[in-house]
């Protein structure tokens, strides 16, 4: 043996005499050397050692066994320490172990010890909770006394995982009585290791021990008291057997298996049969339903040791019927039988007890058997003291034949008695069976009513101390619902052998333990489960049968004994664990559902998993054995799991985790937006987010013009240029191709800035055929001389919107040569309705100076006889209302130099006889009313020859755009008295400025009949110098009604040479009917050079939005035919000089209508070479941005056929009073007939190319490009006229303007649509420049005239 073991052996040999004294505080205490030596070898495992026992200080026997682990020894020693009543420790020499203080006195010196006799009572309570061990404690204490020696031996065994038996020997000089009362709580649980502590005390001591282990289920209470008077020397041997396996998988002797049955584990220990059912939730066993001929029972699976106490606590329901109250039956019997496990008695009168040999028990009977039933019933008649109706309770015994007898006694304690609480309403009543194994007294309590009896005689009669238990109920001809509700049932098993199957590595049960039960001395074959466990991956290692002395390993049998036995089989785990997990697909950026690694292991230990290769963002949680987290990167990863069990068996499992992105990116919603045109917008941020964390690509479509998308910053910005509402679509795409589409609306509203670019193209074809035939006869005599003063008052209401202004200056040099011969007679009636819509705007200033030299030659044959003298004064008032809408406003200022040469040949013959020298005063009162519906017939013969030379200079600037639609109704009444004589030479200079807004559409029908007699003598020389400037910008629709009243009274004598200067300004709304026939031959070559200077200052605001798309192609065909016949007879005699006053009132009602069909096909070609030099100084505060696109295509075809016939009747009544002095009388009669047929064919071709460039040093930029091609060919001859012309004009204009201060350029008016343009300055400047040009032109002409006269 080892050195330490030898020292331990020696310490045991000298245990009685060797003590150690040491000081604890002020006191001296003693400690056995055994304790000190034992702890010298603590923690050293050993396989076997010998304990030598020696009589009178010698040890003669060596025993071997298994040792305990170091932790078990420490636990045992600690418990010993607790069980010894410590008294004191020296402050300077604290002992390593507890002090074996056996009621010792304080030692005053080191030489004497006094020990007194005492009585020892030991109460031991052990509490364990839910561990994997079973603990059964049987404590037997034998105490022997003699005057000199007392030896106390305690045998304690338990089926813990460790085995601990202690052996002690001691001597006490006095009598001792030892009493032990041990209470322990234990059960089956899953704790790996436990420490069981057994305490043996041989000297008379008073010790209380309480040990707590982590388990609790069963309560074992053992009370043992014994005394002895003979001197006895007892020795118990402790087998410190330590397992050689890694864990202390121990077996314990099952000498006292205390079982607690409750509703939760009832099925583990008890079995139902027959009609019985069990409800675990309530713990109720229903033995019979409320039905006939039923039997149900519940039996205990193991035997009850009658030497140990047992206790049943619960409730019983006997139903709601009993004898005398519905004849209920049969009752419930509780039987204790020495027979076979699971055996039950008969039903009926036997109440589950009869039929069992040498059994005993207690019954609750609801049916009284007054007479003895038949022999097969195995029951005698019930006693008479419980007859007369009502349920009763009583003890019952059976004989060897199984015939049951209801026990009666003279003592009320155990005599049969009726129940104080009869069954009602299926109510549960408390029921309790309490048996004391020491006194053999059984006490039964039902609803507070008690029966008590000592059943030791029945136990002796049965021939055994081990009994099976059954609870039985039945019904026959009477019924009842009969139930037992379990509370707890505590008992001690007997004649059982427990077999465990333990993992050698972990020390845990591989499969639940099996309990074999039977009768004492019965041989039972047990199964080591080797085949089944091999299939589970275990190899058989060894068996421990140290607590089953009757075990035969060869035959695998065990012989049952009163004491419980235990056999343990050990197995080694050789199978690696497995992990079940499938390939996974998860979404990036989202917290995943945990991937649980389902680990399966045949072993009882824990499995450790090592996980590698996880995707970014994931981790392994060993506590839950799952993979958790949020993946952050897309891709596929191979994950490896290495699983290792406690036996170091390993397995490797791989699977894939594919991180994908199937979620489309999210876009922060963008609400509908709006802004003003030409106003920069605040950037619109497109906020996107993707679960992958990667960048998102945005594609934006449907942006309004002027806005752009910046993909770098994901913003929409810019300046919108078009008014309107757009739907913007955003398509957001992540790296995986997932798309999200978002839309919102963007509205661009009006602002003070706009852009316009206009492109228009027009093609027009026109063809006209006109045929006219006229017969006219006329005789006329007239003398007239007139001065007309006309006053016109016009009121016009107009609405005008102008969308563009432009300023242009040009200087042109034009040379024109023309030769023309024309002769035409035509009558045509044309009714034209035209609707034109144009969106254009220009403002131009132009000054033109033109010189023209014209030579003309004409031949004319004319015969006329006329004498006329007339003076008249006319005053008219006109009122017109018009509404116009204009899209064009223009101001032109131009200066041009033009030279024209015209050759004309004219032949005229004239016969005139006129004598007029008169002074006349005439008063005339005329009243006329006319109604006409006539056909006019006219016959005239005229022969005229005339020779004339004409020279004219003209300067004209006219811009006119007009569309008019008017209807007029007029009534005119005229009263006139006039006398006139005229022989005049007149020269006139007129400056006319007209602004007209006209839209005309007229329907007319006229009927006239004319009778005239006139005589006129006239001689005239006309020189005309005319300069006119016309500015017209009009688009009007007018309806007018006019009433004209005229009153004139005049006396005039004229023989005058007059010059006339007239300045007229007209604003008119007109209704027009046109009749035209034309035939021309024209060849034009022009070259113009113009120079201009302009100064302008204007403020303007232009809001222009132009959208135009038109194509024009028109064809028209017109055929007009008219026939007119008129006859006229006029006789006039007048005095030569007259003063005339006339008052004229006229009312006229005129309705006209015209229809026309025009076919025109013309081609014009023009060639021009123009050089323009322009100097311009502008001061402008306006900014106008115009961008307009216009494509115009128009196709029209019209066919018109007009036939007209007019009939006129006129009735005139005239009253006049006149006073005249006249020296001449003239009578003229004339008949003329004229018939003219003409045919004219005209073809013209011209080519015109014009290109103009201008530069303005201002804030404005203007660019014009014009290309024109014109070809004209013309030939004509008298008679029938056919005209074809075709022209093509293409113009492209682009204007860009800037307006800086729109607020100053336009004043807002109420919503009338009117707009005030501050262009008065421009008008004044224009007028000034025109005046200067005219004065310069006049001065130049005068100089030329002076040069001619000097020449």
Swiss-Prot record:
<feature type="compositionally biased region" description="Low complexity">
    <location>
        <begin position="149"/>
        <end position="228"/>
    </location>
</feature>
<keyword id="KW-0134">Cell wall</keyword>
<feature type="region of interest" description="Non-repeat region (NRR)">
    <location>
        <begin position="231"/>
        <end position="751"/>
    </location>
</feature>
<feature type="compositionally biased region" description="Low complexity">
    <location>
        <begin position="752"/>
        <end position="1294"/>
    </location>
</feature>
<dbReference type="InterPro" id="IPR013783">
    <property type="entry name" value="Ig-like_fold"/>
</dbReference>
<feature type="signal peptide">
    <location>
        <begin position="1"/>
        <end position="89"/>
    </location>
</feature>
<feature type="compositionally biased region" description="Low complexity">
    <location>
        <begin position="112"/>
        <end position="133"/>
    </location>
</feature>
<dbReference type="InterPro" id="IPR019931">
    <property type="entry name" value="LPXTG_anchor"/>
</dbReference>
<dbReference type="InterPro" id="IPR056573">
    <property type="entry name" value="Lectin_L-type_dom"/>
</dbReference>
<keyword id="KW-0572">Peptidoglycan-anchor</keyword>
<keyword id="KW-0130">Cell adhesion</keyword>
<comment type="function">
    <text>Mediates binding to human platelets, possibly through a receptor-ligand interaction. Probably associated with virulence in endovascular infection.</text>
</comment>
<feature type="propeptide" description="Removed by sortase">
    <location>
        <begin position="1313"/>
        <end position="1351"/>
    </location>
</feature>
<dbReference type="InterPro" id="IPR013320">
    <property type="entry name" value="ConA-like_dom_sf"/>
</dbReference>
<dbReference type="InterPro" id="IPR015919">
    <property type="entry name" value="Cadherin-like_sf"/>
</dbReference>
<keyword id="KW-0325">Glycoprotein</keyword>
<keyword id="KW-0843">Virulence</keyword>
<keyword id="KW-0732">Signal</keyword>
<feature type="modified residue" description="Pentaglycyl murein peptidoglycan amidated threonine">
    <location>
        <position position="1312"/>
    </location>
</feature>
<dbReference type="GO" id="GO:0005576">
    <property type="term" value="C:extracellular region"/>
</dbReference>
<feature type="short sequence motif" description="LPXTG sorting signal">
    <location>
        <begin position="1309"/>
        <end position="1313"/>
    </location>
</feature>
<feature type="region of interest" description="Serine-rich repeat region 1, SRR1">
    <location>
        <begin position="90"/>
        <end position="230"/>
    </location>
</feature>
<dbReference type="Pfam" id="PF00746">
    <property type="entry name" value="Gram_pos_anchor"/>
</dbReference>
<feature type="region of interest" description="Disordered">
    <location>
        <begin position="751"/>
        <end position="1323"/>
    </location>
</feature>
<dbReference type="GO" id="GO:0007155">
    <property type="term" value="P:cell adhesion"/>
</dbReference>
<feature type="compositionally biased region" description="Polar residues">
    <location>
        <begin position="100"/>
        <end position="111"/>
    </location>
</feature>
<dbReference type="GO" id="GO:0016020">
    <property type="term" value="C:membrane"/>
</dbReference>
<comment type="similarity">
    <text>Belongs to the serine-rich repeat protein (SRRP) family.</text>
</comment>
<dbReference type="Pfam" id="PF19258">
    <property type="entry name" value="KxYKxGKxW_sig"/>
</dbReference>
<feature type="region of interest" description="Disordered">
    <location>
        <begin position="100"/>
        <end position="228"/>
    </location>
</feature>
<dbReference type="Pfam" id="PF18483">
    <property type="entry name" value="Lectin_L-type_dom"/>
</dbReference>
<dbReference type="GO" id="GO:0005509">
    <property type="term" value="F:calcium ion binding"/>
</dbReference>
<feature type="region of interest" description="Serine-rich repeat region 1, SRR1">
    <location>
        <begin position="752"/>
        <end position="1312"/>
    </location>
</feature>
<dbReference type="InterPro" id="IPR022263">
    <property type="entry name" value="KxYKxGKxW"/>
</dbReference>
<keyword id="KW-0964">Secreted</keyword>
<protein>
    <recommendedName>
        <fullName>Serine-rich adhesin for platelets</fullName>
    </recommendedName>
</protein>
